[in-house]
Each structure stands twice: as structure tokens, then as C-alpha cells.
Amino acid sequence: MNNILVITGARGIGDLIYQLPLLRSLYLTYKTKLILVSNKVNKAKDVYKHEDFYDEIIEFDHTRYSTIKTIGKIKYFLDLINRYNSDLTILTSNTTRLMLPVYFSNSKNKIIFGTKKFFIFKDKTNNYLTSSEKI
């Protein structure tokens, strides 16, 4: 695989640390550096600055807005994902405003954590867990 895009909607530094084994494993398994798309508030560039599994970290705004503004943000996020023509896109969150752009993206393979077969229905069996524990 040439391009692997990993999108994290997690807001905390602790969530980034919990994702380290996943990111390192992807890098070692596919022998390619990852492109990380991360919520700008979690400081991923600072947390991962000494890691070698990524090629680039793109920060995005994952703030909740009004419905009209959210639709515009979803379109912007879809364009951002499509810009990288990834072979594999992994979304570590099941937030609808992140799931929709991933589903409609031009990525060849898509993995979204915490969804059932039809993407509008979320898997709520692990709702008592934090985002990090779900990974």
C-alpha cells in the first residue's frame, strides 16, 4: 500500500498515546509511513514529534457547529481526504461528521472503528468505554 491515511477525532493527548501501538503496527506491517489527520486541539505534532511512523500530520477543526456550517465542514473534510488518494483510510472515531466524508471519499479501502454494517447505525455495545479504550 502506498498511502495510508489515519484519521483520529480524539481530543485528548491520552487518546493519542493509546493509539501509538496501532500506528506503529500499521507502519511495520505495511512498510510505509502514515499520513495522520488529527484534531488540532490534541497537539499530535508535539506528541508524535520523535516518532518515525508518519510522513505528515494534518490538523483539522473537529468542533461542533450549526447544521449548515457542519455541512460545509464535511465537504471541506471530504476534499481533504480525497487530496491524498489513499489506498487505506482508517477512522478511529465513529462521529457522523467524520464518518460521512470517509464513506464518500475516493479511498480504495476504508475502516471505521465502532460502526455496524450500515454506517448510520453505530455500534453502541462499548459505549461505557473511553475513545482510547475502544481502540
What positions do the PLM features span?
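Catalytic machinery of carbohydrate-active enzymes
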Residues: M1-I135
